[in-house]
Amino acid sequence: MKVIGLADSELESSLRKAGIGMSASEARSIASILGRDPTLAELFCYDAMWSEHCSYKSSRAVLREFLPTEGPNVVLGPVEDAGIVSIDDEWCVVISHESHNHPSQILPNEGAATGIGGIVRDVNCMGARVVATADPLRFGDPYGRESSRVRWVAEGVVDGIWQYGNALGVPVIAGDVVFSRCFDYNCLVNVVAIGVVRRDEIIRSRAPPGSGEKGYDVILIGKPTDSSGLGGVIFASDTLREEEEEANRGAVQIPDPFLKNVLFKANEDLFRLVREKGVEIGFKDLGGGGLTCASSEMGAAGGYGMEIDLDRLHVAGEFPPEVLCIAETQERFLIIAPRELRERILKIYNEDWDLPNVYEGARASVIGRVTTHDRYIVRHRGEEVVNVPIKHLTGGIRYERVWRPRIRNLVEPDVRMPEDLNRVMLDMLASPNIASREHIYRYYDTEVQGNTVIRPGEADAGLLAPIRERDFGIALSVDSNPFYGRISPYWGGATAVAEAMRNVAAIGATPSTLTDCLNFGNPEKPEAFWEFRESVRGLADAARNLWLKGHPNQPVPIVSGNVSFYNESPEGAVDPSPVIACVGIMRDISRAITMSLKEAGDGLYLLGPRFDELGGSEYYRLIWGVTGANVPVVRFPLERSMIYTVIDAVDREILRAAHDISNGGMAITAAEMCMLSDHGISIDISDLGDMRSDKLLFSESSGFVVEVADGAEQEFVSIARSYDLNPVRLGSVSTGDIEMARDGKMLVRLDPEEAREAWSSGLREAMR
């Protein structure tokens, strides 16, 4: 394709007509390296590999500057498809975190389903058994001007997740959902998957050492390649425009969970074969960027070149080479294996698991080889259509983006004290951002595989016991608050980390690792890039300062993640949304607790003082229609002490329930502990300071409300004080109403059934 000698305007026009999204300067850079005009197929390959989605060209420098990715428990950091941390000397947990935002806004069902499909492949290709997923979701205002579209998107996304996940047989054990007008035109569908693998059975997503010298085979398995998902990574690296919606539908992939299920079982046989033979293979899923991305990255990661013959692909029709290279057809993996295993591998997929009869055209095919040269070469019908330096293709391009603080001029509102706090409580319990998520997770098979210990909605984190002969469990939580990010991207990032860790601690698990999915607007806009940079700085500071328990001054490592830019439309960008997942390890699952109250007469304690921090709170936004300015901040030593106190108290079996304080503040936290129990509460906030009662009740400063077993209160206070905390006894669990008093005056008295009805119906009504 002509590049050299064209004026910028001519070149840009030529690129767009060909369906290529790169800039004229990027095309010129490619031509300069090659010393010639690139072929059309080469430009398509570079367009995918140099996209924001694949290359991290705007974000990589910031991530490297700030994020802590190493720690004493890290086995594999964020260099391949998933991160790995140790559980003990034998077992490891594998985790990956991705986004599928743009596809889910255009085709909600297919977009969400393929998001789940892609993330479980990322974990499986490390040799792991996939044991759970999580789904942090962000939708527009269900009562706003785009309510019909918002509800259509939300319903489609939930359907896509449960239809794919249930058919695949992987439980959803965690997730959250936030509704805000800023997501009207850009929903966020982030997905997390975790798996388990023995340390000595980990498989890497790279060409193994010696594979180039020995000419290892490259084997493609799964669905026949078609044109579905073509340009998906380019589509994900641009701003959504309503007038282009129909044209973008082709960039959304088509899922097939039943084929995926068979592939996972066949992969187990592959892993068994590899162990028996004592050989190392490379294994990688085909996601964004398709065949070109998977094959070139595997070759480059191993320090080798790659030769691919497109005529040997199993395909679903006639397609030009550029389509075969970058189409994002789902349910595919790539294997790099010794030639002597070729026939055994082909037999596993084509005969033992009979892929051609599971899905028309599906199979395993040898499509190329690893080489010792440094080129990425693709042939089609006997001709070279791609011949480029492999490290140049995979190395991407880097931009030093300009950043400039966004000035919002936010102020604290002067609101009056509500006359009827009962009404305020009921309205907040019914808010779509607080109400029970049962309307969503009732569709999910949360107990498939039989490993689930704590299901979604029962506690702040999900918990499963994936290894039957072991006592340990794996906890998972996901968190982010875009309303905090709107006020302060830095504290939005820090609070997301802190809350994710609190949620894991609330069941008694010890935070072990973090992942991030960073959802922001256009990085070419200085204010948007500043928001991104500040959020990363905030979450990194929290990870560094909250520490791995038992390892002072060691950060909680961030081992996997994703950056999703261009989450904006002509109406504007989404609020800064760094979504954090936290994995925790529970050494003895029999000691885990939930959030529901257990015994009348038990003491209720508050950990964490209340501050005048209602900026971005549900109280300000829902009741008064304002944002505020005093966003919750993370006081790192205090936060660390609260988390450690709860973990130790659960381990000593003196806590019966715990719930972290976040959306809605202490009052909503305490009321939610009644929702799944037959108990009420009687608490008094007289000893909490001089702030006005509504601020004490609804401030979203971090903390916990915990139920302490009768007779164990002194021991609990002793644990807390060992961490320099002064827990406050709020009151006790009762058999009556939800009561909150101050200085002899009853502030709140709610019938638990009335409160439960508001809480259980809020999300159902919003999505009706």
UniProtKB/Swiss-Prot annotation:
Catalytic activity line of the entry: N(2)-formyl-N(1)-(5-phospho-beta-D-ribosyl)glycinamide + L-glutamine + ATP + H2O = 2-formamido-N(1)-(5-O-phospho-beta-D-ribosyl)acetamidine + L-glutamate + ADP + phosphate + H(+)
Binding site for ATP: Y56, D516, G561
InterPro entries: PRibForGlyAmidine_synth_PurL (IPR010074), PurL_linker (IPR041609), PurM-like_C_dom (IPR010918), PurM-like_C_sf (IPR036676), PurM-like_N (IPR016188), PurM-like_N_sf (IPR036921)
Pfam families hit by this protein: AIRS, AIRS_C, FGAR-AT_linker
Entries under SUPFAM superfamilies matching the protein: FGAM synthase PurL, linker domain, PurM C-terminal domain-like, PurM N-terminal domain-like
Amino-acid positions noted as binding substrate in the UniProt annotation, renumbered to this chain: S99, H100, N101, H102, R121, Q253, E328, T329, Q330, S564
Active site: H53, H100 (proton acceptor)
Biochemical pathway: Purine metabolism; IMP biosynthesis via de novo pathway; 5-amino-1-(5-phospho-D-ribosyl)imidazole from N(2)-formyl-N(1)-(5-phospho-D-ribosyl)glycinamide: step 1/2
Keywords per UniProt: ATP-binding, Cytoplasm, Ligase, Magnesium, Metal-binding, Nucleotide-binding, Purine biosynthesis
NCBIfam families linked to this entry: FGAM_synth_II, PRK01213.1
PANTHER family hit by this protein: PHOSPHORIBOSYLFORMYLGLYCINAMIDINE SYNTHASE SUBUNIT PURL (PTHR43555:SF1)
Protein name: Phosphoribosylformylglycinamidine synthase subunit PurL
Organism this protein belongs to: Methanothrix thermoacetophila (strain DSM 6194 / JCM 14653 / NBRC 101360 / PT) (Methanosaeta thermophila)
Gene this protein is translated from: purL
